[in-house]
């Protein structure tokens, strides 16, 4: 599977400083019934996803959201590492597992914070 364009639009939404433009990125990236689940939130639909983006942007003003790995994919699933940084300092890092629908839109995002724990 090629690197899906929808992932780039989703990332662009997190980095968009103009709130009036966030929705356009999300509509190019997300399925209408998108689910976003990470340790801090669970959202359903584009409206809730957009509200979460705005909430996180307000909580970490000036943050830069970036992928820190390539995108590994099979079937309709993608995984990649990411980080949030501000003024050159990493604020949070983690990884996402993203499911796409048949049209290549993001259907589900499962986010995890921090590195994986050590094995037993």
Annotate the PLM regions:
Residues 23-75:
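A solvent-exposed, acidic/Ser-Thr-rich amphipathic alpha-helical stretch
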Residues 62-64, 90-93:
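Short solvent-exposed loop/turn micro-motifs enriched in small/polar/acidic residues
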Residues 66-71, 82, 94-99:
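Hydrophobic/aromatic beta-strand elements that line small-molecule binding cavities or substrate pockets
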Residues 79-87:
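Short beta-strand segments that buttress and anchor functional surface loops
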Residues 1-32:
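Short acidic-aromatic low-complexity motifs
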């Amino acid at each position: 599977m090629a690197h899906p364009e929808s992932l780039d639009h989703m990332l662009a939404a997190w980095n968009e400083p103009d709130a009036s433009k966030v929705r356009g990125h999300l509509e190019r990236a997300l399925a209408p019934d998108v689910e976003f689940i990470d340790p801090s939130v669970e959202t359903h639909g584009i409206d809730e996803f957009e509200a979460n983006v705005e909430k996180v942007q307000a909580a970490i003003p000036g943050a830069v959201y970036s992928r820190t790995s390539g995108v590994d994919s099979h079937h309709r699933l993608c995984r990649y590492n990411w980080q949030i940084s501000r003024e050159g300092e990493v604020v949070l890092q983690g990884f996402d597992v993203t499911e796409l629908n048949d049209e290549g839109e993001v259907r589900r995002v499962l986010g995890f914070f921090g590195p994986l724990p050590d094995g037993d």
